[in-house]
Regions:
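Short Lys/Arg-enriched alpha/beta "domain-start" segment
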Residues: 7-70, 74
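Ser/Thr-rich, low-complexity intrinsically disordered terminal regions
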Residues: 54-76, 162-183
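Intrinsically disordered, low-complexity segments enriched in Gly and acidic/Ser/Thr residues
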Residues: 137-189
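Short, hydrophobic/proline-enriched secondary-structure or compact coil segments at domain edges
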Residues: 20-29, 92-101, 207-213
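A cross-kingdom marker for long, charged
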Residues: 181-219
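Soluble, non-membrane globular domain cores that form compact, hydrophobic packing
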Residues: 9, 87-92, 110, 117-128, ...
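Short, small-residue-biased leader/transition segments that mark boundaries at the very start
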Residues: 1-6
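Extracytoplasmic beta-rich ectodomain segments of secreted or membrane-anchored proteins
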Residues: 47, 55-142
Length: 219
């Protein structure tokens, strides 16, 4: 299965630290909901994810109302947001965001990816679920080493390189694997694998990001 290959390719290096972020964001429905309904939706999402020690808070700023459910722990965190945007003379918009962060492991990433996908599908929200794996390596890599590192990962995944680009200290790769059902288009190319390799001079650390279909984090 491709997920196992993805983990194996990511885990082929000796990382100091690893973490994973799994998230999805999409437009919700055509009927404006009450605060009670929003809270029920967030609580049902939390129940499906498997958390019960969460807190819920509501904020309002300018034309944006946000109801947020969150739970933090030593091994990770969960953040669910129901966002309502009101603009004068414009129809309101509602969005649902669900994010799970795992610390010190990436093993359960695709379990949560499946859960979040199910939640979004049940709510008839058309969106992509992003899985971002992140690891730190001590020291710097040359541009050639970054290219080889990324190519080795692609080879293990049987993914075809679409674009590879150096920008300052970051090497970014966009690729496609036909074993992954979902993809996005960059120009005329299908893309569903994204690798970013960057360097932090102060920490003397190289950070590797492996995402499907696209890295949504700062690097």
């Amino acid at each position: 299965e491709f997920r196992r290959v993805l983990f194996r390719s990511f885990g082929s290096a000796s990382y100091k630290e690893v973490c994973a972020d799994i998230s999805a964001y999409g437009k919700y429905g055509s009927m404006e909901l009450t605060d009670t309904a929003k809270e029920i939706i967030l609580e049902k999402a939390a129940e499906k994810i498997g958390i019960n020690r969460y807190t819920i808070e509501q904020t309002s700023r300018d034309n944006v109302e946000t109801m947020q459910l969150s739970q933090n722990g030593e091994n990770g965190s969960v953040l669910c947001r129901f966002i309502t945007i009101h603009q004068e003379n414009v129809e309101y918009e509602q969005y649902l965001y669900i994010g799970v962060t795992l610390k010190n492991t990436v093993d359960a990433s695709f379990t949560y990816e499946k859960l979040i996908r199910q939640i979004m599908e049940e709510m008839q929200i058309d969106t992509e679920v992003n899985v971002n794996l992140k690891g730190q390596i001590h020291g710097a890599l040359t541009d050639t080493q970054k290219e080889q590192f990324a190519q080795d990962m692609l080879d293990m995944m049987n993914a075809k390189l679409s674009v590879g680009r150096h920008m300052e200290d970051v090497y970014t790769v966009y690729a496609y694997n036909k074993g992954i059902k979902n993809y996005i288009m960059i120009g005329k190319d299908k893309v569903n694998v994204n690798i970013c390799i960057g360097y932090d001079e102060e920490k003397n650390e190289t950070t590797v990001y492996l995402a499907t279909p696209m890295n949504m984090q700062d690097y």
